[in-house]
Amino acid sequence: MSANENNLIWIDLEMTGLDPERDRIIEIATLVTDANLNILAEGPTIAVHQSDEQLALMDDWNVRTHTASGLVERVKASTMGDREAELATLEFLKQWVPAGKSPICGNSIGQDRRFLFKYMPELEAYFHYRYLDVSTLKELARRWKPEILDGFTKQGTHQAMDDIRESVAELAYYREHFIKL
């Protein structure tokens, strides 16, 4: 293991909703790949404690999804708050990628970055300002080569580490079938 500026940091958050002014992070996971999308290491998957009052603000979709996955119970049982989760994630990332080198990688990653900016600003600042957003390729494929879209299916567990692994696999799929490298 050594920090390499070409490695990519992949991240996914599960939140109580989509508005960082009202909602909170309830799960964070990261993994690191090399430039060829080979997974080098998986970071900690952390349920971030939130109060019962905060959890009660979730809409029906979030309650159903995060209860079915067991995340609500893990959040209630967790002793890690935003700052502890942020520090544990940074400790992992520093082993693999120097600060400011990796774009933030994932699916619809701009949404996650909004929450990081508000609740985990030190972690948000660890990333390069650029984004590697797999959903951009999906949108381009939908418009320019829709016949390839059915070739990749997500499980959609809405568990952070599962979602990241799927994002890496989805980018590899688009690299082969859309970009054709």
UniProtKB/Swiss-Prot annotation:
Subcellular compartments: Cytoplasm
Domain Exonuclease: 8-171
One BP annotation, GO: RNA catabolic process
Phenotype on disruption: Essential. In depletion experiments the level of oligonucleotides is elevated and that of mononucleotides is severely reduced compared to wild-type.
Activity control mechanisms: Inhibited by adenosine 3',5'-bisphosphate (PAP).
Keyword entries, A-Z: Cytoplasm, Exonuclease, Hydrolase, Metal-binding, Nuclease, Zinc
Gene Ontology MF term list: 3'-5'-RNA exonuclease activity; metal ion binding; nucleic acid binding; oligoribonucleotidase activity; single-stranded DNA 3'-5' DNA exonuclease activity
Catalytic machinery residues: 129
Gene Ontology CC entries for this record: cytosol
Record Pfam families: RNase_T
Positions annotated to bind Zn(2+): 12, 14, 163
TM stretches of this protein: none
Family, per entry: Belongs to the oligoribonuclease family.
Functional summary from the UniProt entry: 3'-to-5' exoribonuclease specific for small oligoribonucleotides 2 to 5 nucleotides in length, as well as small (2 to 5 nucleotides) ssDNA oligomers. Probably responsible for the final step in mRNA degradation.
PANTHER family: OLIGORIBONUCLEASE, MITOCHONDRIAL
Subunit and interaction comment: Homodimer.
Name of the protein described by the UniProt record: Oligoribonuclease
Gene for this chain: orn
